[in-house]
Design a protein with these regions (language model features):
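N-terminal, charged/glycine-rich beta-strand/loop interface patches
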Residues: 1-79, 84, 91
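Cationic, beta-structured binding surfaces that engage anionic biopolymers and membranes
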Residues: 61-64, 76-82, 89-91, 107-110, ...
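A structural signal for small-residue-enriched, beta-sheet-centric alpha/beta enzyme cores
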Residues: 108-179
Length: 179
């Protein structure tokens, strides 16, 4: 495939384990967006966290992104399917220069309800940390278990949810200046 699909925006496809992650797997990805560079980081397909072994050794995916001066990074991976019995940990660490822009999402699907395989056992620990020049701006830690997915105060039985994070350059004025 072409490296540049849209002008100067480079596309980076992370070829994670195509069959998914099992107990004991650990995937660490590090990205540095150089000054003035523009990149879309994505995956060619859904990530998958399969049922853990009986000893519940987790599957861990850790992503570190550093966006330097005047850089732009869109981190838009495909969804992650958390299979019944999975014990996954997803960590995302983002550091953005004061003159850089970051746009990212995470989309999770719990179980395969349509196939008769709901998420009834296991857990997912998801953490997101966003910093500007090393100073923490946002921190989120979630522990999602079947009870959380089903609780009215949780996902109320919905099996899919996503979060979006946008970090604008520090002195960008208004959103329309950037968009």
């Amino acid at each position: 495939q072409k490296l540049f699909h849209d002008g100067e925006l480079a596309h980076c496809y992370v070829l994670h384990p195509p069959g998914g992650m099992v107990s004991g797997d650990s995937l660490q990805s590090r990205f540095k967006v150089n000054p003035g560079a523009k990149v879309l980081i994505t995956t060619p397909a859904s990530g998958k966290l399969y049922q853990a072994r009986q000893n519940q050794i987790p599957q861990i995916a850790s992503t570190h992104i550093d966006v330097t001066s005047d850089g732009f990074c869109a981190h838009l991976p495909q969804d992650t399917i958390v299979f019944d019995g999975a014990f996954g940990e997803l960590e995302t660490f983002v550091n953005v220069d004061s003159r850089a822009l970051f746009f990212g999402w995470e989309h999770l699907i719990f179980g395969r309800r349509a196939g008769g395989h709901p998420f009834e056992n296991g857990q997912l620990i998801q953490s997101l940390r966003v910093s500007r020049e090393g100073r923490l701006l946002f921190r989120e830690n979630l522990r999602l278990i079947p009870q959380t997915v089903n609780a009215v105060s949780g996902l109320n039985g919905m099996v899919s949810f996503a979060s979006l994070t946008v970090v604008l350059p520090q002195n960008s004025g208004t959103t329309s200046d950037v968009v």
